[in-house]
């Protein structure tokens, strides 16, 4: 039929699952469904607790909160398929739309979830990291080298400083997100005993092509949207992504249009997914940045 409709819950669930599988950030972030735009309280610092004596006063907590607006940015994918393809190949139209739309929307969202500037797009993981007063802790290393890391421009000590700059309470469950190029160079770094920082996982040691290993004991994820090494670039983030939250507003909508491209015997399908995202606790993330020169 020609017109827009909200997909059934079963299809919606499969679309969200496909998005999660196709998006690096979505696969590790917290996700929440919300029916409308809203303001949410963001905790700027964890409160403290102390033992008090009987009859003693309880001092005020140092926890502070701000409010951030959660909007809904409309991600749309237009899929065009020939009737011959759908008819002759016996393709399940529902599966075809889910796969194609999910992959297209996931690519767009993954880019914005990484470096979105909160202006017409979600607030990315690294938004504010390059500000004069960074919103998240930044460890600087290197000399702007765009090809490799050496003892002259990036040492094991700097990588250790970066990882351990994340407060200990957030390290459990934390992961590293970086680019393939940076990972290659991080894997070449050795400690003074000659051991690589990168260690293969037990399964990878047993089976070729096993799951990825770790950097300093922490899992890593590769995103094509992380910058390669260059001056003043954020090239990796280590953090607890339970504190990066994706808000999906409402259900996915699909418009099936068999008429606009009827002269070429094609069907158009437009899929719309509304989402926003932001860091809910800045101190749960630390960035690794190439120096200016």
Placement of each model-derived feature along the sequence:
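Acidic/polar, low-complexity extended loops/arms that serve as protein-protein interfaces
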Residues: 1-173, 187, 193-214, 220-221, ...
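Intrinsically disordered, low-complexity terminal tails
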Residues: 1-4, 287-293
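Short conserved micro-motifs at the rims of enzyme active sites and ligand-binding pockets
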Residues: 51-53, 90-92, 187-191, 229-234, ...
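Active-site scaffold segments
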Residues: 99-101, 266-271
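A short pocket-lining beta-strand/turn micro-motif at the edge of beta-sheets
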Residues: 172, 216, 250, 263-267
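Hydrophobic, well-ordered secondary-structure elements that form the walls
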Residues: 176-179, 220, 269
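C-terminal hydrophobic structural anchor segments
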Residues: 213-256
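Short proline/glycine-enriched turn/loop segments at secondary-structure junctions
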Residues: 256-262, 275-277
